[in-house]
């Protein structure tokens, strides 16, 4: 399954970009990043179908890493070919996008800079795929 991160803002050469790259290199599933301007631009349609859309949103569900892995694993096993992860800019996502998403996820109650959220998402995607592969990286409790 392709993991497609669609993020507002250019990450450029930054410590956050280094973190994203570090975890992206470890992910054995397909990986793609599309950057959009902070304002304007349109979210591209899925490259593959069937697909799922996950919006990173402060009002979303707070999942454990194992719960997140289970969702991705179920989608993969159900034949989903692409999961798109949308990271908004400073103002987040509009209501229409939130309503159209298959899942809303939050990284806790705090508000995170969108560049840091991208690095956190990359780590969680690595962790989820490693859990599904039975890799010892993740430890519960």
Swiss-Prot record:
It comes from the Bacteria. S-adenosyl-L-methionine binds at residue 88. It is an enzyme of class 2 (transferase). It is found in: Cytoplasm. Pfam families: SPOUT_MTase. One of its GO terms (cellular component) is cytoplasm. Its EC number is 2.1.1.177. Keywords: Cytoplasm, Methyltransferase, rRNA processing, S-adenosyl-L-methionine, Transferase. The keyword Ribosomal protein does not apply. Signal peptide: none annotated. GO terms for molecular function: rRNA (pseudouridine-N3-)-methyltransferase activity. CDD domains: RlmH-like. It catalyses: pseudouridine(1915) in 23S rRNA + S-adenosyl-L-methionine = N(3)-methylpseudouridine(1915) in 23S rRNA + S-adenosyl-L-homocysteine + H(+). HAMAP family: 23SrRNA_methyltr_H (MF_00658). Specifically methylates the pseudouridine at position 1915 (m3Psi1915) in 23S rRNA. Belongs to the RNA methyltransferase RlmH family. PANTHER family: METHYLTRANSFERASE (PTHR33603), RIBOSOMAL RNA LARGE SUBUNIT METHYLTRANSFERASE H (PTHR33603:SF1). This is Ribosomal RNA large subunit methyltransferase H. It comes from Novosphingobium aromaticivorans (strain ATCC 700278 / DSM 12444 / CCUG 56034 / CIP 105152 / NBRC 16084 / F199). The gene is rlmH.
């Amino acid at each position: 399954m392709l993991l497609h991160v669609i993020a507002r803002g250019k990450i450029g050469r930054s410590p956050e970009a280094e973190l994203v790259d570090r975890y992206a290199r470890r992910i054995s599933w397909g990986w793609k990043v599309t950057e959009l301007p902070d304002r304007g631009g349109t979210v591209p349609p899925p490259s593959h179908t069937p697909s799922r859309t996950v919006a990173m949103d402060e009002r979303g569900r707070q999942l454990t890493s194992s719960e997140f892995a289970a969702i991705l694993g179920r989608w993969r096993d159900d034949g989903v070919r692409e999961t798109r992860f949308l990271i908004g800019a400073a103002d987040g996502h509009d209501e229409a996008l939130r309503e159209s998403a298959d899942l809303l996820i939050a990284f806790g109650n705090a508000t995170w800079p969108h560049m840091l959220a991208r690095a956190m998402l990359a780590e969680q995607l690595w962790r989820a795929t490693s859990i599904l592969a039975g890799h010892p990286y993740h430890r519960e409790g």
